[in-house]
């Protein structure tokens, strides 16, 4: 599991624009076909290129160790849960290693991962996660993002709201000295949230993985050592 992209950048795939296909769809398809991380994910068995973002976060901050309990919010299609499963050496028989993953969309089974197909915002979802976790969590991670509409300010605020909800949940379930990871889009309104996070965690960092597309405003909030 490395970020060596040798051999993934050599071939450019061109996409003809169909009369029936919107230009935006053609651009998305072209970007996917020519993205070295998409190709690398297919070859290495990861379900999405997002897997490499979490790997980079781990290699930078060394968050994951065996015998952890983890909550993955917005898990589909499962790339982050796959990475976490490998890093904590999860198995279906080891109750000390546990990953609870949640999303509205279904994901295929992953070793050591218990998946809940639920809306995180439903009233009973938090209680269900806490019940299934059987104790406090070591890491809460959220790659949740709202469906983008191309309006940066709106996309920023919608994803920031998801991050705030994930943060409030993390405060309830994390053990002391444990960690929270979440995606945000830069846009200026995140300062108030960052101040809240800094009051609850000893170290708070911004991190943009190399595997995050350069044109994207996404960054990751890495909050270490809950007080």
Curated annotation (Swiss-Prot):
Database matches in Pfam families: FtsJ
Sites where the protein binds S-adenosyl-L-methionine: 78, 80, 103, 119, 143
Family matches, as PANTHER family: RIBOSOMAL RNA METHYLTRANSFERASE (PTHR10920), RRNA METHYLTRANSFERASE 2, MITOCHONDRIAL (PTHR10920:SF18)
Domain of life of the source: Bacteria
Catalytic activity: uridine(2552) in 23S rRNA + S-adenosyl-L-methionine = 2'-O-methyluridine(2552) in 23S rRNA + S-adenosyl-L-homocysteine + H(+)
SUPFAM superfamilies referenced in this protein's UniProt entry, alphabetically: S-adenosyl-L-methionine-dependent methyltransferases (SSF53335)
Name of protein: Ribosomal RNA large subunit methyltransferase E
Compartments where found: Cytoplasm
Entry-linked InterPro entries: RNA_methyltr_RlmE, RNA_MeTrfase_FtsJ_dom, rRNA-MeTfrase_E, SAM-dependent_MTases_sf
Catalytic residues (positions): 183
Annotated function: Specifically methylates the uridine in position 2552 of 23S rRNA at the 2'-O position of the ribose in the fully assembled 50S ribosomal subunit.
Similarity remark: Belongs to the class I-like SAM-binding methyltransferase superfamily. RNA methyltransferase RlmE family.
One GO MF term attached to the UniProt entry: rRNA (uridine-2'-O-)-methyltransferase activity
Gene that produces this protein: rlmE
């Amino acid at each position: 599991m490395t970020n060596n992209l040798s051999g993934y950048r050599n071939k450019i795939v061109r996409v003809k624009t169909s009369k029936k296909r919107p230009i935006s769809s053609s651009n998305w398809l072209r970007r996917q076909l020519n993205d070295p991380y998409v190709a690398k994910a297919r070859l290495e068995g990861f379900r999405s290129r997002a897997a490499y973002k979490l790997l980079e976060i781990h290699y930078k901050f060394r968050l994951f160790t065996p015998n952890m309990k983890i909550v993955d919010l917005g898990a589909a299609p499962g790339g982050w849960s796959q990475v976490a499963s490998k890093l904590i050496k999860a198995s279906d028989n080891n109750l000390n290693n546990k990953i609870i993953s949640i999303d509205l969309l279904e994901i295929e089974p992953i070793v050591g991962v218990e998946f809940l197909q639920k809306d995180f915002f439903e009233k009973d979802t938090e209680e269900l996660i806490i019940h299934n976790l059987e104790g406090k969590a070591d890491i809460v991670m959220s790659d949740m993002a709202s469906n983008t509409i191309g309006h940066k300010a709106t996309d920023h605020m919608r994803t920031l709201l998801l991050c705030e909800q994930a943060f409030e949940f993390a405060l309830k379930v994390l053990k002391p000295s444990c960690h929270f990871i979440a995606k945000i889009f830069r846009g200026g309104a995140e300062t108030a949230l960052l101040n809240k996070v800094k009051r609850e965690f000893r170290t708070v960092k911004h991190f943009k993985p190399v595997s995050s597309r350069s044109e994207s405003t996404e960054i990751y909030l890495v909050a270490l050592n809950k007080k």
